[in-house]
Amino acid sequence: MAGLTQSPSPPAPSLLSAQTEGGEFVESLGFNGTLLAQMFNFLVLLILLRAVAYKPFMNMLEKRRELIEGSIAAAEEDKKQAEQLRATLQADLQRSREQATEMMARATKNAEEQAQQIIEAAKAEAARVKDSALSEIQREKERAVAELRDQVATLSILVAGKIIDQKLNDDVQKDLVNKFVKEAGDLPC
């Protein structure tokens, strides 16, 4: 109230009449009429300010508060959605890692199985080649033994013919050859 100054304008007619008529009464109570008029003016100004400035200002503040609360709620909702998206992406990433690990394990297992199959096939081929070679060697051995028997028989006949220096008949000659071949067949080769 110290900042309020007294206006040089004359008091309003209603106040003037109240001052003149009841001015003595008010003054007898120890009140100054000017002070009462200033209080009345302040109340009127307060009511006008409330109607004109305070309510729009408060409405603006309320709208601003609602806007801020809405922004905070939207930010919290966005944060929740971002958190859900992050969790989903994290789960997808983990699932992808597990699938990649599983694929690598399967590929390694398949490669090991193929390597084992190749080794087994090579062993089987080596065994087949070995068996074939052994069979061929056995056939060659048998053929060589048969040729050797034939040559031994022929040589035996020639040697026997020269030793005996006589001509044997065919039956005796065959018996001698067969006996010699049989004895030669029992020899270790």
Curated annotation (Swiss-Prot):
An example Gene Ontology molecular-function term: proton-transporting ATPase activity, rotational mechanism
UniProt keyword terms in alphabetical order: ATP synthesis, Cell membrane, CF(0), Hydrogen ion transport, Ion transport, Membrane, Transmembrane, Transmembrane helix, Transport
Alphabetized InterPro entries for the sequence: ATP_synth_B-like_membr_sf, ATP_synth_b/b'su_bac/chlpt, ATP_synth_F0_bsu_bac, ATP_synthase_B_chain
Primary residence: membrane
Bilayer topology: Single-pass membrane protein
GO CC terms: plasma membrane; proton-transporting ATP synthase complex
Annotated transmembrane regions: 35-54
Matching CDD domains: ATP-synt_Fo_b (cd06503)
Localization terms from the record: Cell membrane
PANTHER family named in the record: ATP SYNTHASE SUBUNIT B (PTHR33445:SF1), ATP SYNTHASE SUBUNIT B', CHLOROPLASTIC (PTHR33445)
HAMAP family the UniProt entry points to: ATP_synth_b_bprime (MF_01398)
Function of the protein: F(1)F(0) ATP synthase produces ATP from ADP in the presence of a proton or sodium gradient. F-type ATPases consist of two structural domains, F(1) containing the extramembraneous catalytic core and F(0) containing the membrane proton channel, linked together by a central stalk and a peripheral stalk. During catalysis, ATP synthesis in the catalytic domain of F(1) is coupled via a rotary mechanism of the central stalk subunits to proton translocation.
Binding partners and assembly: F-type ATPases have 2 components, F(1) - the catalytic core - and F(0) - the membrane proton channel. F(1) has five subunits: alpha(3), beta(3), gamma(1), delta(1), epsilon(1). F(0) has three main subunits: a(1), b(2) and c(10-14). The alpha and beta chains form an alternating ring which encloses part of the gamma chain. F(1) is attached to F(0) by a central stalk formed by the gamma and epsilon chains, while a peripheral stalk is formed by the delta and b chains.
Family per record: Belongs to the ATPase B chain family.
The name this protein goes by in its record: ATP synthase subunit b
Organism encoding this protein: Desulforamulus reducens (strain ATCC BAA-1160 / DSM 100696 / MI-1)
Taxonomic lineage from the root: Bacteria, Bacillati, Bacillota, Clostridia, Eubacteriales
